[in-house]
Amino acid sequence: MKVFNKNGNEINLIQGTKDIVITPNPGYELLYNYSYATDELAFIIAGIKKNNGVFTMDDDDVARMDVTCKLGTSYCGLGNGTDWTVNSIGYAFISSNTIIIGDRNSLGTQDRAYINLVCRLSWYKH
């Protein structure tokens, strides 16, 4: 959505944001990425697909980011290839620049992870 000031000039609602680049590791595919960083926080909004098999409790290191974060953790939605429906709850961890995904219920049927996670960037100091 575009926003304009009283003089008709376009303005940014969030100043100083940077897009975060996510690179999937071999065996994984990036479905979408709307992730960005401010001066102190990273907002990870992404979908990752496991190409061969499904997510399990043993999955780790599914992708890398071009920013470094302090530890972040959140639940994530898990689905399968039939549609965009979330069928199960998994977990997402961010450690340094690594994204870790796992199926906390070990259903053995979910190959897509939908991540919405906020964590602090490692260079931010109070």
Describe the predicted segments one by one.
Residues 1-61:
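Extracellular receptor-binding modules and their adjoining Ser/Thr/Gly/Asp/Asn-rich linkers
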Residues 13-19, 70-78:
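Short, hydrophobic/aromatic-rich segments at coil-to-beta transitions
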Residues 29-31, 48-64, 72-126:
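Extracellular jelly-roll beta-sandwich "head" domains, especially the C-terminal globular C1q domain
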Residues 36-39, 68-72:
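A short, structured loop/turn motif at beta-sheet edges
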